[in-house]
Regions:
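Short loop/turn positions at the edges of beta-strands in beta-sheet-rich folds
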Residues: 19, 27, 37, 53-55, ...
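Short histidine-centered beta-strand/loop micro-motifs
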Residues: 12-18, 34-35, 41-42, 62-63
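Short, conserved beta-strand element in jelly-roll/cupin
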Residues: 6-8, 17-32
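Double-stranded beta-helix
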Residues: 57-80
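Short acidic-glycine-tyrosine-enriched beta hairpin
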Residues: 36-54
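Conserved short histidine dyad/triad with adjacent acidic residue
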Residues: 1-18, 52-56, 75-79
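Active-site scaffold segments
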Residues: 23-27, 46-52, 72-73
Length: 80
């Protein structure tokens, strides 16, 4: 089911895999995501990510904007 999440300015989520394959729609703010292979990208409002790293180290995320990040999370398939 659709979930809305707010992450405050300065928030940091250490390494974690995604709970399931899902789309993340960035509604406001900017965050930086780093993958296990060392790739890092800044993602801003209006972007849509397909998160598929459900196994292993996963990714880490940091809010880099001065305002909170608002995201909508949409599973790509029903949970089992």
């Amino acid at each position: 089911s659709l979930a809305f999440v707010s992450l405050p300015a300065g928030w940091f989520g250490d390494w974690h895999p995604a709970p399931q394959r899902q789309f993340v729609l960035l509604l406001s703010g900017t965050f930086e995501i780093e993958t296990g292979d060392g790739e890092s990208r800044k993602i801003s409002a209006g972007s849509v990510l397909l998160v598929e790293d459900t196994q292993g180290q996963g990714h880490r995320t940091r809010v880099v904007s001065e305002q909170a990040v608002q995201v909508a999370i949409v599973p790509s398939s029903p949970s089992k």
